[in-house]
Each structure stands twice: as C-alpha cells, then as structure tokens.
C-alpha cells in the first residue's frame, strides 16, 4: 500500500516505527511508551511484535511504559524508576511479591494487579 503517514492507524504507525528502528540491525532498541494511544487488542499485537523482534534479532530492548499489562507480558528484567533514580529492579515474580510500599502503590493501582496481589 502507498499510504501517507497521516492515513495510517495508530497501530500501523507503531509497526512502521519499529520497522524503521530495526532496519539497521541495532544492538539496542528503546521503545518509549510503545502502546500509548492504542486499543488493548492492538497493544497486545505490539507487545508480541517487540518480543518477537527482541528474541529473533538478539536485540536488547528497553521499554519505557506505565502499562503494567505490557510490563508483565514482555518484561524480563523490570526496573521501577522514580525521579530519575532506579528504586527497584527484578523479575516479574519479584515485582508481584515485593514489599516496597512506593512500588506497590504504583504497580497495584490497577484493579487487575490488586486482584493478583490479593491471590498471592
């Protein structure tokens, strides 16, 4: 298709941006809020795309996001940064079971994660 950028959907723009970023085979890929403005179904597609690219191309990928669903879907090592300082880092399991009050307030603000924590 020969569409102008203004004619692309939000998900298509994200895919094009990712393709442009990896075309030169970088060692690192930085994704800043890759799911912002996307519906949940498209966000999952973008998460899967990032995961696939990371694994197949052996690219170290850093994802900056506030979307806890994305964090749990694609995060291997997760870091919580507040005011430019890394306050916590660890695995998904460590994130769910942590005792850091500030981190818990942020992570479990979502109803989904409140239920997850309650079931632990």
Stretches found by the model and what they are:
Residues 4-8, 12:
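Conserved ABC ATPase signature
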Residues 96-120:
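C-terminal boundary and immediately downstream tail of ABC-type ATPase nucleotide-binding domains
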Residues 40-42:
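Helix N-cap at the start of a conserved alpha-helix in ABC-type nucleotide-binding domains
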Residues 29-32:
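Catalytic Walker B motif of ABC-type/P-loop ATPase nucleotide-binding domains
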Residues 65-66:
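H-loop/switch region of ABC-family ATPase nucleotide-binding domains
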Residues 25:
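Conserved catalytic motifs of ABC-family nucleotide-binding domains
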